[in-house]
């Protein structure tokens, strides 16, 4: 199976909260994750993350910076992606697209998917014990390997 290319962003507001989107479908259905999605043909990574954030949340992005790149594999739905993580500042009022939900949350909140915890830690927004996080990821059907170090 071909590895898809995606871009996601840790959008932070003036209060240090991070913008999350409830996933409607796919391997992460029901989970609260960072906004983002697939990169379209001919589109840059930055343009893709800006477009996806605007579509999913209504927000624009400022101060966008690349943080990390991961190979992500999910075994149940055979999802494979190369995901580029950005960090930026959200501009505008957050609103969900039809059938979805968005919320501002503390980056160190409880109950987050292990993949989100890894991303927030790499973006410098959350402290995590690497061994504990690796064990948490092992309990999911998702593997994440950072490939930019």
Residue ranges and their predicted role:
Residues 2-4, 34, 65, 79-83:
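Short connector loops at helix/strand junctions that flank enzyme active sites
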Residues 17-55:
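Conserved Nudix-box catalytic region and its N-terminal flanking loop in Nudix hydrolases
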Residues 59-68:
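A short coil-to-beta-strand element that immediately follows conserved catalytic motifs
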Residues 31, 95-149:
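Nudix hydrolase/Nudix homology domain
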Residues 18, 27, 73, 92-94, ...:
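Flexible, glycine-rich phosphate/dinucleotide-binding loops
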Residues 13-16, 24, 89-93, 107-108:
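Short loop segments at secondary-structure junctions
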Residues 70-94:
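Active-site-adjacent beta-strand/loop module that shapes the phosphate/pyrophosphate-binding cleft
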Residues 1-18, 69, 87:
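Conserved N-terminal beta-strand and adjoining loop/helix that marks the start
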């Amino acid at each position: 199976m071909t590895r898809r290319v995606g871009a996601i962003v840790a959008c932070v507001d003036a209060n240090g909260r991070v913008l999350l989107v409830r996933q409607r479908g796919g391997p992460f259905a029901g989970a609260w994750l960072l906004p983002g999605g697939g990169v379209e043909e001919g589109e840059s990574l930055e343009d893709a993350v800006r477009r996806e954030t605007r579509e999913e949340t209504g927000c624009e992005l400022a101060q966008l910076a690349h943080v990390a790149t991961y190979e992500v594999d999910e075994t149940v739905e055979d999802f494979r992606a190369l995901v580029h993580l950005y960090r930026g500042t959200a501009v505008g009022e957050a609103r969900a697209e039809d059938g979805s939900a968005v919320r501002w949350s503390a980056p160190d909140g409880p109950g987050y998917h292990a993949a989100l915890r890894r991303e927030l830690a790499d973006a410098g927004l959350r402290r995590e014990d690497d061994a504990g996080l690796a064990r948490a990821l092992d309990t999911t059907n998702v593997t994440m390997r950072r490939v930019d170090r």
